[in-house]
Each structure stands twice: as structure tokens, then as C-alpha cells.
């Protein structure tokens, strides 16, 4: 089995449904919270973590349906998470999700899922994901810790500076092919120069170079 990694964006008009109200459902809700998904939770009871999160903001994006799952609850859903301990409920959710052509994750049954959530590091708009089919969890955990040591405050500021540079380029030249040749060469040379500084002098020096380049942009 192979995987197809993607990042979902522009989700404002899409519905995500969580079946279940326990701690696993709470973690899944937290992972969806900062997306633009419309979120629906269906469960006869909710744990304190879910109650705290959904009452945190008046404009909460979450609709709560306080009853057990029923066939038909996944109509118009794009993404579905079943986080219950009832295998019969999970099986029925899986059947309906397949019929409705939803993305479906049964949290305790990978065989009845067509997606799962990787381990992630999130720093603003920078997301680093760790995922493997049948890989060693300890090795992935070690790799994650290595990345955590690399991605410090200076690296985040470097990333944000390069992001602003690209945003300004896109603003001035919405069509990538319209970038004048001299500007294109300047940008490509800067990219190569930045990586060279990063490798030879470290993150702080690269951040300084990126900020200086940003100041010179129109």
C-alpha cells in the first residue's frame, strides 16, 4: 500500500463530521479548529475538552448534535472522522462514508480508513509532517525531535522573510511568466546565495540576508 500526501486548502464551504465525543474526538477537533472547515460533532455526550474548546469562542465553527449517529448524518460531508469505541457504529459510518465518497478515518481501524493524520510540527504557516506506512514509530519520533532542534526562532523568522519576498513577487507579477528576466535572475541568484549562507554560516546569517533583500524590494 502506498500513500498520497496532500495539504487541504480553501475549505470554507466544506463540511467535516466527527462521530464521537471522547478524548480522541477532542484531539481530532483541535486539529480541525484552525481550518476553514464547517465542523459538525455527533455524539450523545461530550468530554470536557470538547466542551471547553467549543465554548471558547462565540463564533465557534462547530455544530453539536447531541445524539447517537444515524444513517444520513454524512450527507454533504467532505471529511469524516469516526472516534467511537462501538465497532458497529464505526462500520456503519464507514459504509455510509464510502457511499457518499467522503474522506474517512476510523481512528481505531486503519483498514477502514482512506486517510489518517500524520504527526506534525506547526509553526505559523510552516507545517512539517511525518508519516509512514508500517514504519518504526520510534524512528519517526527521533526524526521529529531532530527537526525540532533545527526549527528554532531564527529559522521561523527566516522562513517568514522568504515568504514575504515571494508574496511581494506574486503581488507585482501575478503571472509567473511576466517576471522580467533580470528580476528572475536576481531572485534565482538570491535563492542560491541564501542556501549557501545557510549551509556555511548558519540560520542567523541567512535570516539577516533575507531581511536585507526584503528591504530592497519595491
Would you name each region that the model predicts?
Residues 43, 64-68, 108:
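Short loop/edge segments at beta-strand edges and connector loops
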Residues 106-156:
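E1/E1-like adenylate-forming module used to activate ubiquitin-like modifiers
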Residues 55-75:
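Glycine-rich, highly charged phosphate/nucleotide-binding loops
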Residues 79-85, 90-116:
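ADP-ribose/adenylate-binding Rossmann-like module
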Residues 134-218:
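An accessory alpha-helical subdomain
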Residues 1-45, 50-53:
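Hydrophobic, well-ordered beta-alpha structural blocks that scaffold small-molecule cofactor pockets
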Residues 39, 64, 103-104:
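Hydrophobic beta-strand scaffold residues
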Residues 22-24, 88, 134:
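Residue-level detector of alpha-helix initiation sites
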Amino acid at each position: 500500500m502506498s500513500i498520497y500526501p496532500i495539504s487541504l486548502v480553501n475549505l470554507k464551504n466544506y463540511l467535516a463530521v466527527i462521530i464521537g465525543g471522547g478524548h480522541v474526538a477532542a484531539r481530532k477537533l483541535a486539529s480541525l479548529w484552525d481550518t476553514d472547515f464547517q465542523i459538525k460533532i455527533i455524539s450523545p455526550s461530550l468530554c470536557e475538552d470538547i466542551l471547553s474548546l467549543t465554548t471558547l469562542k462565540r463564533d465557534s465553527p462547530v455544530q453539536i448534535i447531541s445524539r447517537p449517529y444515524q444513517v444520513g448524518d454524512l450527507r454533504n460531508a467532505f471529511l469524516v472522522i469516526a472516534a467511537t469505541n462501538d465497532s458497529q457504529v464505526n462500520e456503519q459510518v464507514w459504509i455510509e462514508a464510502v457511499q457518499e465518497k467522503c474522506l474517512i478515518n476510523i481512528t481505531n481501524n486503519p483498514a477502514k480508513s482512506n486517510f489518517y493524520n500524520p504527526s506534525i510540527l506547526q509553526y505559523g504557516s510552516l507545517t512539517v509532517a511525518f508519516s509512514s506506512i508500517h514504519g518504526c514509530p520510534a524512528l519517526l519520533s527521533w526524526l521529529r525531535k531532530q527537526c525540532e532542534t533545527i526549527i528554532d526562532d531564527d529559522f521561523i523568522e527566516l522562513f517568514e522573510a522568504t515568504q514575504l519576498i515571494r508574496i511581494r513577487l506574486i503581488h507585482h507579477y501575478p503571472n509567473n511568466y511576466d517576471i522580467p528576466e533580470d528580476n528572475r535572475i536576481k531572485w534565482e541568484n538570491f535563492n542560491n546565495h541564501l542556501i549557501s549562507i545557510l549551509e556555511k554560516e548558519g540560520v542567523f546569517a541567512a535570516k539577516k540576508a533575507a531581511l536585507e533583500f526584503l528591504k530592497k524590494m519595491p
